[in-house]
């Protein structure tokens, strides 16, 4: 609809179509083309010096680089992952990458975040207080040390940190 004459439209026919429910995740390996069509998406990436666009965007497109690095596996859809509860109110998404892990703090009771620092996080719903911060919906935070998080009254807080 937004890019009706973009040649990137043909590329869509070669991609897997997945429909995820809230809270579900997929792990996409380096070099595998991906995009999302609608909704909200949290994307965590390993350290890299490239994001290569080939279409469906008004930003710079680098088709030559994409063709050089692309890895298009002929396997079935990526496996949908759900987070595993680490402790009450804290869930972790399984990651095969040492570079990062994604953690979800979702609670209406106090929780203690005590490992995996530093974390970069965004509050999707609710608010909370910690010893040093007031966490507000729509804001992002850098968490450098253990924190007791007291939701006021509910918190949904996604964090990305080093996978230890």
Enumerate the language-model features and the residues they cover.
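Conserved short histidine dyad/triad with adjacent acidic residue
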Residues: 22, 86-91, 98-116, 145
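N-terminal non-catalytic cap/leader segment that marks the start of a structured domain
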Residues: 100-102, 117, 122, 137, ...
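Conserved AWS/pre-SET-to-SET junction and N-terminal core of the SET lysine methyltransferase domain
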Residues: 1-22
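Extended, charged low-complexity segments
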Residues: 141-164
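Short loop/turn segments at secondary-structure transitions that flank enzyme active sites
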Residues: 34, 48-50, 163
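Short acidic-glycine-tyrosine-enriched beta hairpin
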Residues: 17-37, 42, 105, 129-149
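C-terminal, non-catalytic macromolecule-binding modules
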Residues: 39-92
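Glycine- and acidic-residue-biased ligand/ion/polar-headgroup-sensing regions
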Residues: 1-7, 37-40, 107-137
């Amino acid at each position: 609809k937004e890019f009706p004459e973009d040649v990137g439209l043909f590329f869509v026919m070669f991609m897997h179509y997945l429909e995820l429910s809230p809270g579900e995740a997929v792990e996409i390996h380096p070099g595998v083309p991906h995009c999302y069509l609608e909704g909200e998406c949290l994307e965590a990436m390993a350290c890299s010096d490239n994001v290569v666009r080939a279409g469906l965007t008004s930003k710079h497109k680098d088709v030559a680089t994409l063709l050089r690095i692309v890895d298009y596996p002929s396997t079935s859809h990526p496996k949908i992952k759900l987070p595993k509860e680490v402790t009450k109110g804290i869930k972790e998404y399984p990651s095969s990458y040492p570079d990062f892990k994604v953690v979800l703090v979702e609670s209406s009771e106090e929780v203690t975040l005590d490992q995996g620092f530093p974390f970069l996080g965004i509050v999707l719903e609710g608010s909370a207080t910690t010893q040093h911060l007031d966490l507000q919906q729509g804001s992002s935070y850098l968490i450098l040390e253990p924190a007791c998080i007291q939701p006021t009254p509910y918190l949904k807080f996604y964090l990305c940190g080093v996978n230890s």
